[in-house]
């Protein structure tokens, strides 16, 4: 990058470019406009550090949901799943994925899972924000409002789903690529890493969507008054 005029006008511009995800950095910093999104360019499992305990105190924590209401049937052996990602921002500025769920459930069971999960999250991490996606249109608004009502008494926010899945994932991917993300060891790790490494070419991206939205929530959240360990 040799635009000296721009660097003089904005000395922080180069640092901002270096903080982008690999694909965007290749385009804007190195002028490589031939690069295309492909599996392995956003996430690799060796970019994450797997830990067994929290390395620092939690500043903000959220569980984001990616919703589906599909069950496994002979005609649909591998449907989209309802997925959720519990992520926290730590006092040291890093991020940790604490838990990921991925289930093929009907609508009634999805609602029960959301309530039970919110109760378990609050018991373990106290002030957890539950993030519900809102699809465009009236049906999306009605579903989000219904789920928010179902979770009355919990800290709930809704967000309208906009932009491509790649655009939504890039801020999280940038932090992962710069070594700022950890994963709590768990039985769900393998399936999570498999899906992330296949993004955006893989058949399913439910966990990627949930993780991207959870990252957005904790990255923007105000710090807690009281930190928890």
List the model feature ranges, each with a label.
Residues 67, 134-136, 206-210:
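Generic detector of well-ordered alpha-helical packing
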Residues 75-83:
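Short, flexible loop/turn motifs enriched in small residues
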Residues 29, 172, 210:
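A residue-level signal for conserved active-site and pocket-lining positions in enzyme catalytic cores
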Residues 215-229:
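Acidic two-metal-ion nuclease catalytic site recognized across multiple nuclease folds
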Residues 195-219:
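Charged alpha-helix within mobile-element recombinases
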Residues 3-74:
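ATPase catalytic-site recognition across NTP-hydrolyzing enzymes
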Residues 1-4, 134:
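G-domain G4 guanine-recognition motif of GTPases
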Residues 83-202:
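Mg2+-dependent endonuclease catalytic cores in nucleic-acid-processing enzymes, primarily RNase H-like
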